[in-house]
Amino acid sequence: MAAAEFLVLLKRECETCRMVGPVLAGLKARARLTLWSQDDPAFPEQTGGALDDRSLEQSWKHKVEIVPTLIRLEGGREVARTEGWNRADWARLTGIENIGKDLPPSRPGCGSITMDPGMPERLALKFGDLKLASRPIEVGEMDDPHEVAYDRGWSDGLPVIPPTDLRIARMLAGTTRKPDEVIGLIPPNLAECTIEKVAVNAVMAGCRPEYFPVVLAAIEAALKPEFSMHGLLATLWFSGPVVIVNGPVTKRIGMNWAGNALGQGNRANATIGRALQLVIRNVGGGRPQEIDRSILGNPGKYTFCFAEDEADPDWVPLNVARGHARGTSTVTLFHGDGVHGVCDQRSRDPESLSRSLALTLWSVCHPKLAQWSHAILVLSPDHYDIYKQAGWGRGEIEAGLWQALKRPGRDLVRGASGVAEGIDPSHANELVDKFHPGGLLVVRAGASGGLFSAVIGGWTAQRRNSEVQVVSQEIGT
C-alpha cells in the first residue's frame, strides 16, 4: 500500500489555523505534508511557512470551503478529509494518537476565501472548465454601460444590468445545464440560442441565479410550435406571453401570488417575465415597429409573470388541472393582453357570481364575438370564498362559468342591437359558447379586502384553436 501523505489548506486570518500551527509542525516531522496558505506563504511559522495559494487555485481545485482542511492522500488520490480542528478526526486521518493533546478537543474552522461572495464564479472562470462563448464588449472607462446597452439596442426601454463575465457565471451556476447546450431557435429570426445566451439576458433582466430554471422553462414553453411565438410577435393585436408559475418553486424563489400579484414590486415576478422578453428581443430580433407590429401593445410586454395561490389544499392548481402531478413545478404560457378588473360586491351565491363574471368575460375581444380568443380569470380570495363556502371547487366553478357564458346567437349576430360587428348570421338560432373548450383558464391570486377579480383577455389568433394553444412546461434544474 502506498504511504499516506497529507495536504493542509489554511490561512493566517483564521484563529483555528493559527492554533494548529504546532500540530502541523509535529505532523511535518513525521509524515509527508504539503501546506498551502491562502493569504500568507510565511504562515505558519512553526513549519517554516507554506506554499503560496493566494491565487486560490489549489483551494479551488480541492473544493475547500472551510479552513483548516486536512486531506489524506494515498497514491496521490484523496481518501479522506476533515475540516476545522477535531482531535479524534485528525487522529483517525493521521494515525497519530493524542495528536494536539494540549489543544481543546475541537474547534470550528473558518470560511475559506474561496467562498467569499463572487469568488466561486471568479475561480470557475479562471481555473475551471467554464469558458464563455459570448463576444466581450469593451466599455470605455468614461462610458456608462447602461447607455451602451441602450445604444446597442439591448434594452426594452428600461435600464439593464451589465452582463459581466462574473454575473453570467453566477447565473449559470443556477442550473445544471451546460452553457453551450442549444435550447432552441428563437423567433422571429430563428437564431440559435444557448443556455449561456439565456443567462446573459437573465442577468440583464435582473434575475437571481435561483430564478434561472424558471426562465429556461419559460423559453422552452414559448418555443413549442403550438404556442406560435413567431405569430404572437408579428400580430397587430395587443398580446404578449403571460407566464403563470405553479409548484414548490414559487415559494422557494419568493414569487408573489398575493397582493399586487399582477403588478410591480416582486423581483422574481418582474425579472422572469422580462428575461423571456429580452431573449426574444436580443437573440431572436423581436423588436417593436420591426417584426413586432402591435398597433398598441400592452404594458405586460415588458414583463407579465405571476404565481398561482396554492395555499388552499382543496384547490386544484392550474398545472394539476392541465395534467401535471401535484407538487410539480411548472410554467404555463398564455397569449395575454392587459388586465381588466371585475367588481362584484353584491353576489353571495356561486350562481350569481358566475353570471356576473361571465358578463365581463363576454367583453373579451368584443361582446358580440365568440370563440375568437381565450381568457384567464384570476379569482381573488374574497370571490373564491363565495365559491368555497358553497362547496364549489375548480370543477364546479369551471362548469358554472361555462354554463353562464352561453348566449343566444340572435343577440350576437352582425347588426343585432344596432352594432355591425358580431358572429355569422348562420348561428342566430344556436346557443353560443364564448370560448372554445379549454379556452378559459381559472387561477387564484391576489389579496383579501375587496370583492374584485381580474380578466386577462387573449390573442385573437386563438380562434384557430387547433393551431394556437396554451402550453405548459415542467421546470428542471
How should each PLM-predicted stretch be described?
Residues 66, 71-109:
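Non-catalytic, surface beta->alpha helical segment in thiol-disulfide oxidoreductase systems
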Residues 2-24:
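Short active-site neighborhood of thiol/selenol oxidoreductases, capturing the structured segment around
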Residues 100-133, 140:
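Iron-sulfur (Fe-S) cluster-binding modules
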Residues 30-55:
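Thiol-based oxidoreductase modules, predominantly thioredoxin-like and allied folds used
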Residues 9-13, 36-39, 380-382, 445:
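Structural motif
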Residues 61-65:
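A short glycine-leucine-enriched loop at secondary-structure breakpoints
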Residues 124-477:
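Non-transmembrane, aqueous-exposed alpha-helical and coiled segments at domain scale
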Residues 4, 27-29, 37-39, 70, ...:
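Catalytic cores of nucleotide-enabled group-transfer and carboxylate-activating enzymes in metabolic
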